[in-house]
Amino acid sequence: MSYGDDYNNNDRGYGGGRGFGGGRGGRGGSRGGRGGFGGDRGFGGDRGGYGGGGYQDNDFGNLPKQDWDLEKLPQFEKNFYKEDPAVTERTDEEVTAFRKENQMTLHGDGIPKPVTNFDEAGFPPYVLKEVKQQGFEKPTAIQCQGWPMALTGRDVIGIASTGSGKTLSYCLPAIVHINAQPMLSHGDGPIVLVLAPTRELAVQIQQECSKFGKSSKIRNTCVYGGVPRGQQIRDLARGVEIVIATPGRLLDMLESGKTNLRRVTYLVLDEADRMLDMGFEPQIRKIVDQIRPDRQTLMWSATWPKEVQRLAHDYLKDQIQVNIGSLELSASHNITQVVEVCTEYEKRDRLVKHLETVMENKESKCLIFTGTKRVADDITKFLRQDGWPALAIHGDKQQQERDWVLNEFRQGKSPIMVATDVASRGIDVKGINFVINYDYPSNSEDYVHRIGRTGRAGTKGTAYTYFTEDNRKQARDLLVILREAKQHIDPKLEEMGGGRGGRGGWGGRGGRGGRGGRGGYRRGGYGGGGYGGGRGSDITGSNSAPLSNSRW
């Protein structure tokens, strides 16, 4: 049983029908019951003709391109926002001050005022109950402005850093949206589609949707590659209101006829910049072309490059936009950034030195980033042989093993995780105190996203970075980030960023120096070579390397 099975919702349905409080039927009379879709299904008889004018051939394999006829499409509701009296009474000056305090920049016409607490957001009682049961004290900045924007039914762009609460910004309005639509019939696809760049992020989004959809019995499934398709196909066949998917696997499901997007009226593109960075733009365009054009589209991103702007221009209409913080690349000020200029040969000694400090606190979690899968495996083996309980996660690991590694890290059973950039975004593990960039990434955007794994939700964190001569081209951009966050700067980095001088050295490898005491850190039951219950043949390569007793 893999860690991922804990929230796969294999029985999907939380019980029979949907109808909290008497079902989804009339909803205050505004929908007029389940009619509206015409006849028994309302999709024009044999479903194939939804949208009217047939299909056109394209270059998308077996996936036909829809030729939409808006006049024949059934109508649907998407504006559910009713401004709370407390929000209405706020003066323009008060609203401006609140937005300034929370570093909000707005673009577009008719943007609703922000809310300042959960009760003002206008969510139905069943949603508010779930929120309060989860222990949230107050909404984040992106939620304060994003919820009213999403609930109006407008197309929305939200630009905010990772860890800012974007998932709930679209998840809760999605639940309201679903409960205002006619229930699914046999053969229907989802009502809400969320596209995400990685399977890890997709699974985390599913967790949030599952938490807040229980009371209204909203079903969801997660569709991603790297695992057998069987369970995902069965979930889709049973019918789910929400599909969270990576573009490649969803496209495969669509082309093979395992699902359709004819019922989608609420589309979310999460971490749009990351999806484009990973080369998913063609797949995204193929998928979005399968969705009715009068849908509501919400695009969320940590950055706002031209490629993302172009995608928004092509697929969003009359959109409203909120940016939290500066659009200039910047790191969280909750993170202490320590950049050390060194040689490639010095990295391992520095890594051990920092781990000795980091792991003095037995509750610490440390995420180490490498530039390649090979280095991730090499470092993991080295650390385990040196007595550190490290595990690796990267694209060559099977999904079951990746899920297990994440769970071991999340629970603190293996408090050191070595990762490639597959984990640099979207993985939301609470309590990561330290990030170590063993290899500096190829660009400063990835640097910011990597170190953003710590210092989240108002907590403090520390990021150590090893910067070598090979990284010289990135020095200027890194200096901008460090100065903006008012961090101490290594004089050697200043020199590299100024472009002065040749490649001159800063000394050879030097001695290893003393490592300090070697014993002492033992967390109950971990030591030896055990894996807290043993995974047998599921664990491969570096993760199966024997663990010395010398350090933990």
From Swiss-Prot:
<dbReference type="GO" id="GO:0000380">
    <property type="term" value="P:alternative mRNA splicing, via spliceosome"/>
</dbReference>
<keyword id="KW-0539">Nucleus</keyword>
<dbReference type="InterPro" id="IPR027417">
    <property type="entry name" value="P-loop_NTPase"/>
</dbReference>
<dbReference type="GO" id="GO:0003724">
    <property type="term" value="F:RNA helicase activity"/>
</dbReference>
<dbReference type="InterPro" id="IPR000629">
    <property type="entry name" value="RNA-helicase_DEAD-box_CS"/>
</dbReference>
<dbReference type="GO" id="GO:0016887">
    <property type="term" value="F:ATP hydrolysis activity"/>
</dbReference>
<dbReference type="InterPro" id="IPR001650">
    <property type="entry name" value="Helicase_C-like"/>
</dbReference>
<dbReference type="GO" id="GO:0000184">
    <property type="term" value="P:nuclear-transcribed mRNA catabolic process, nonsense-mediated decay"/>
</dbReference>
<feature type="compositionally biased region" description="Low complexity">
    <location>
        <begin position="1"/>
        <end position="12"/>
    </location>
</feature>
<feature type="compositionally biased region" description="Polar residues">
    <location>
        <begin position="539"/>
        <end position="552"/>
    </location>
</feature>
<keyword id="KW-0866">Nonsense-mediated mRNA decay</keyword>
<feature type="short sequence motif" description="DEAD box">
    <location>
        <begin position="270"/>
        <end position="273"/>
    </location>
</feature>
<dbReference type="GO" id="GO:0005524">
    <property type="term" value="F:ATP binding"/>
</dbReference>
<feature type="region of interest" description="Disordered">
    <location>
        <begin position="1"/>
        <end position="66"/>
    </location>
</feature>
<dbReference type="GO" id="GO:1990904">
    <property type="term" value="C:ribonucleoprotein complex"/>
</dbReference>
<keyword id="KW-0963">Cytoplasm</keyword>
<feature type="region of interest" description="RNA-binding RGG-box">
    <location>
        <begin position="506"/>
        <end position="535"/>
    </location>
</feature>
<feature type="region of interest" description="Disordered">
    <location>
        <begin position="493"/>
        <end position="552"/>
    </location>
</feature>
<feature type="short sequence motif" description="Q motif">
    <location>
        <begin position="116"/>
        <end position="144"/>
    </location>
</feature>
<dbReference type="GO" id="GO:0005737">
    <property type="term" value="C:cytoplasm"/>
</dbReference>
<keyword id="KW-0347">Helicase</keyword>
<feature type="binding site">
    <location>
        <begin position="160"/>
        <end position="167"/>
    </location>
    <ligand>
        <name>ATP</name>
    </ligand>
</feature>
<keyword id="KW-0690">Ribosome biogenesis</keyword>
<keyword id="KW-0067">ATP-binding</keyword>
<dbReference type="InterPro" id="IPR011545">
    <property type="entry name" value="DEAD/DEAH_box_helicase_dom"/>
</dbReference>
<comment type="function">
    <text>ATP-dependent RNA helicase involved nonsense-mediated mRNA decay and ribosome biogenesis through rRNA processing.</text>
</comment>
<comment type="subunit">
    <text>Associates with polysomes.</text>
</comment>
<feature type="domain" description="Helicase C-terminal">
    <location>
        <begin position="350"/>
        <end position="497"/>
    </location>
</feature>
<dbReference type="Pfam" id="PF00271">
    <property type="entry name" value="Helicase_C"/>
</dbReference>
<dbReference type="InterPro" id="IPR014001">
    <property type="entry name" value="Helicase_ATP-bd"/>
</dbReference>
<dbReference type="GO" id="GO:0006364">
    <property type="term" value="P:rRNA processing"/>
</dbReference>
<keyword id="KW-0378">Hydrolase</keyword>
<dbReference type="GO" id="GO:0005634">
    <property type="term" value="C:nucleus"/>
</dbReference>
<keyword id="KW-0694">RNA-binding</keyword>
<feature type="compositionally biased region" description="Gly residues">
    <location>
        <begin position="13"/>
        <end position="55"/>
    </location>
</feature>
<dbReference type="GO" id="GO:0003729">
    <property type="term" value="F:mRNA binding"/>
</dbReference>
<protein>
    <recommendedName>
        <fullName>ATP-dependent RNA helicase DBP2</fullName>
        <ecNumber>3.6.4.13</ecNumber>
    </recommendedName>
</protein>
<dbReference type="Pfam" id="PF00270">
    <property type="entry name" value="DEAD"/>
</dbReference>
<keyword id="KW-0547">Nucleotide-binding</keyword>
<dbReference type="InterPro" id="IPR014014">
    <property type="entry name" value="RNA_helicase_DEAD_Q_motif"/>
</dbReference>
<feature type="domain" description="Helicase ATP-binding">
    <location>
        <begin position="147"/>
        <end position="322"/>
    </location>
</feature>
<keyword id="KW-0698">rRNA processing</keyword>
